[in-house]
Each structure stands twice: as structure tokens, then as C-alpha cells.
Amino acid sequence: MLTINSTIKKFIAIMISTMLLLAVYFSKESEAVENQIEFKEMVINGDVGHEDKKLIREVNPNYRNIQSWISSVGAAVAINDINGDGFSNDLCMVDPRFNNVTVQSLIGEYEKFQLESTTKQTIAPMGCVPADINEDGRQDIVVYYWGRSPLAFIQKETSDPLSSESFQPKEIVENIEMYSNTLTFSDIDGDGHLDMVVGNYFPDASEVLNKNSVKKPLMQDSMSQALNGGTNRIYLWSEDQGDYLYKDVSSQVPDELLNGWTLGIGVADLNKDGLPDIYAANDFGPDRLLLNKSQPGNIDFTSLTGKKDWKTPRSEILGLDSFKGMGVEFVDLNRDGWLDILVSNIAEEYALMESHFAFINTGEWEQAEKGIAPFENQSVELGLNKSSWGWDIKSGDFNNDGKNEVIQATGFIRGEKEKWHELQELATINDELLKYPNSWPKFIPGTDISGKTENAFFIQNTKGRYGNYSDVFGSSEKKVGRGIAIADVNGDGLLDFALANQWDQSSFYLNKSKVTGNFIGVDIAYSTYLNQDSLKIKEGKDSTKKRHAVGASLEVYLPNNEILLAEVDGGSGHSGKRSHEIHFGIGDIKKKKYPARIKWRDVNGVLQEKNIEVTPGWQTIWLPMEKGEK
């Protein structure tokens, strides 16, 4: 017995020493980088002259003792080319202080204006997504809400300069009382048209924002396995829907996607079969990954989960996790030609000590036949596991050095009275009581839970590990962030971004970095108005009316054997929506042309692939409208 105890003690001592050495090593590694990325911060939603601003929502009486918790979402931002000048310099944002949706030019091309807003206090916009849903070559805007179904604002033919009169509100689905926190577009069934995926939070008809309601809506029924949330929905584009543009096919959705408390939805082709797969980031329960096997008009998904092994806790296995999923991002972090998945959770250094995820795609997709998701969480090894209370997460190469940075919006409720300890107690409550709001601590105005943290900006060092350099945000005032939108606003090859803050002013960050590398930038669109029958590449930006090829992918092959991969994004994430362009930083590599392969679905739904060459700088790839070349 003494020998066993002695052996155990030695083993424990060795393990502790090893962990301490690793901690020192990792901390040194994360510091070994010189930050040369600089931004100029500009406020995009000032409150001067607005006496009607609010800092809390009116809520259902059953939620009054957790009013600040219920009021913690709604700030959102999107950057895109809405006015069709060829540059993604238009910004759409939701400001919960005024319960409105506004559109503005980041370069002053037109006056800031408000989209027609609801006058009902029981309805609140949660985000806006630019998309050409009627396929006329002009960007429309789809707004999603708490309290109703998504509503489209269709851009009219004569809309120069842009104004509120440029958009016509249109119901595109049957209007019901639903509570959406995220929405994205992609061609789910492969028919050549954009479909809509909506992530919902509260159950339908909960009357969350009705201060006079007699209903008694509930909260989650578990902190780790909650399945009593809102019903997520998939809407397919349809020509025969009468008054509506989209058909609700949610009855065909697997149960795994349906009723989590969803805060983030991501859609991308993870296995390279030409169909976009779905990742749902769920609060209070396991995230979900659905492998897409759909055919035109008929959706078909298979749920995948990560493989269990001795070194990975169940709480960090894809599809089995118990963390608080907030945002999701697809990026090929290791440049091996496979899209990886970044996920925001709650990852403070204390209290609810969870972890963010960096699921690295192994490319072993034959495992999917056994229901296994071929991903390994490497957030700890990469240094991406900790920051704060995470929301939107986005990635891009902001100094074009060939290594992607990662931005994360963080923070929960800002106030004067620290309530972390009460939240910690709530996390241990019996699940049978958790769903009843009156059993919760009081989270009312004045509450502070992770309200004084800094948004995260992760930069990778030469050893491959990331360190958090939040000083790039500039402002000394700490705010709680929600949505992030990335775009090259002025076409200089440097990525800029906007960050929407909850109950506060939000900011746009213009990239002013001086030490930068080379880049490849590509705008992929259908040649709706060029009448061409083959793929063509035009140097630079192009203001010709275009229908962006959402879901199209581009692989670029570098002489150092790295493979660059990205897709045209249709709105993945939490409440931030990036522009439709693809951007790669390539460091100091200098060649006139780079071999590449583009994959897309033509407007008839036929999957196309073509070997091409791309050049440094911006270029526009015009896709043929009919069946293209291989």
C-alpha cells in the first residue's frame, strides 16, 4: 500500500510540474509576437439628439426579475455592397437603444436612413442580412426579430442615392410570433437559389416582450442539456408559394437541430461535396453539426458528433458539449484546404470556467458514414480557449502576413453590482427549478456580469499559438460586444471591421496598418447583366449589377504548398454579417499568378468546377448564367 501511495504521489508531482512548465511555455509563446496591426476607431451610431433612447427592454411580467438577462441581445451589424458601387462600404445595423434598423454609407455617399420599423413594443429587430433574394442584381435586406418572422426589404429598381424610399417591405414567409437570434442564407437543397436558415431562442408565441401578458413563459430546462427552446427553421426558395418567396420545410429538419436555445448558425460546405452543412451554436446545451445530403426541393441531413477519446472531456466533443454556444465561424486556420470551425462560449478565467472551441477539420470524411464528425478541438493548443463571455467570432488576415487573426465580441451585462457569484449558484440549481424564472436570482438594471471585459483580438505568433491583443480596439471604455462584420471597405486590400455593442455606441475600425503583406481578393458573382456563356475574370472591383454567388468556394495553391480555402458567406455567425468577398493574405510571396480551383452551383443548380488562375489584388470572377465549363 505504501508503494502504491508513493507511486501515486510521484505521478501527481510529475503531472503538476508538467502542467506548470506547459503554462509557462504557453504564456511565453503567446507573448512572442509584435503587434503591427493598427485601426482608426469611428463611432457609427451616436446618441446626440436622441432623448428617446432606452437601456432596457419592457418584458413579460414573468421575466421582470431577470429583465437585464432578457435584454442582453439585439445589437447587430452587417457590411456589404448595398448600393452597388462595387465596394462593400454600406453598413446596416440594429441599435436596441432605439429599437430600429438603419443603413448608412461608411464613405458618405448618402445620408443615413432608417428602414421602416415596427411600432409595436412587443417586437424587436435582432439583426439584418444583405442578400439578393429576388435575384435582380440588387442587394435586399432581410431583418429578423423577436416577436415575428423575418421581414424582407426589397430594393427597388430606382434607388440612387439610397434612402428609406429605396426599399419596399415584403413578407417572404408566413408571419408568426417567433424569437430569432440569427439568420443566414445558402443554397441548402442545391437548386441554384438562396434558402434561409433561422436560429430561434425562445419558443414560438412566448410573448417575451409583452409587458401586459398573462402568459408565463419559461427559461431553459437545463444549463447543459436544454432542449425546450425555440424551433429552428429552414425555408426553401420557391416559385410556387403564392404571396411568399420561401417555403417552410422545418418539418423535415432532424430533431437535433430543432429546439436548442440557438444563438449562432453557420452554413458551409465542410466535406467538399457541394452542399452546405449546418452548425448550430446552442446556449445551455450541445451544439449540432448536420451533414447535408439534400436534393432540390427535399432536405436531408445526418447528425454528426465528434469521436470520444481518453484525452478529450465530453464537454468539449463536438455535438456532445455542454457549454454555452454563442457564435460560430468557418475558416481554414491551418491552410490545409479544409474549413475549420471556431465557436464562442463562456470562457472567463473564473466562475463558469468553460472554453471556446477550435474544431480542426481532419479531412477524414469517411468517418461520417459512422456518424462521426472528423474534427478535433485544439483551442487550448492554439491559445484560443480563453477570453471572456464570448458572442460573435470572426476571422481574417488583417495585416496580410499569411496568418489569420481572430476577433471576438465579449461581455454580458454591464452595471454596478457584481452578480457573478449568484450566476454561479444558479448554475448549480436543480434542473426542475431552473426553468422557472422566479427561482432565479434578480438580474435587474444595475446588475453586472462580465460587463467590464475587453473584446478579444487574437494574433498568431511564429510558433502557431495565439495571444489576445485587445489593445487594438483603442477605446479605453469597456463595452459589451455582440456582432462583428468584416469587409475591405475602401478596396486597399486591408480588412476593416465593425463591432456592434449592446445598449451603447458601436464602432467601425478602419485598418491603418503600415507593415503589411500581399493579398488575393476575389468577388464571385453571376453575370446576370453581361450575357456571357463562360467564366470570365476582370481585374479590380466592378460596379456592374451582380448576384453574389453565395456558397461558391475558392481554393488557391501557394508555392509553399499551403492551400487557401474560403467560401462566399451568406451570413453565418451570431449577429454580425461579413461582406460577400473572399480575401486571403499571402505575406511576402510574390508571383504574378496563382493556380486556383473554383466550385459553384449555376443558376440551374448544376454543380460546376473549374481550374483558373488568380492574381494579387482585387478581381471579380463573373460566372456564366447557364451551365458552365469544367
Regions found by a protein language model. Name each.
Residues 80, 94, 131, 144, ...:
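Surface-exposed loop and edge beta-strand positions of immunoglobulin-like domains
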Residues 38-55, 65-69, 113-123, 168-179, ...:
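Short loop/turn motifs that recur once per blade in beta-propeller domains
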Residues 73-84, 124-135, 154, 180-194, ...:
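Beta-propeller blade termini
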Residues 178-184, 197, 322-417, 479-516, ...:
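Repeat-solenoid scaffold signature
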Residues 201-227, 344-351, 412-449, 530-539:
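Short, conserved, GDST-rich strand-edge loop motifs in beta-rich repeat architectures
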Residues 99-115, 149-169, 208-223, 228-249, ...:
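Beta-propeller blade repeat segments, especially FG-GAP/WD-type strand-to-loop junctions
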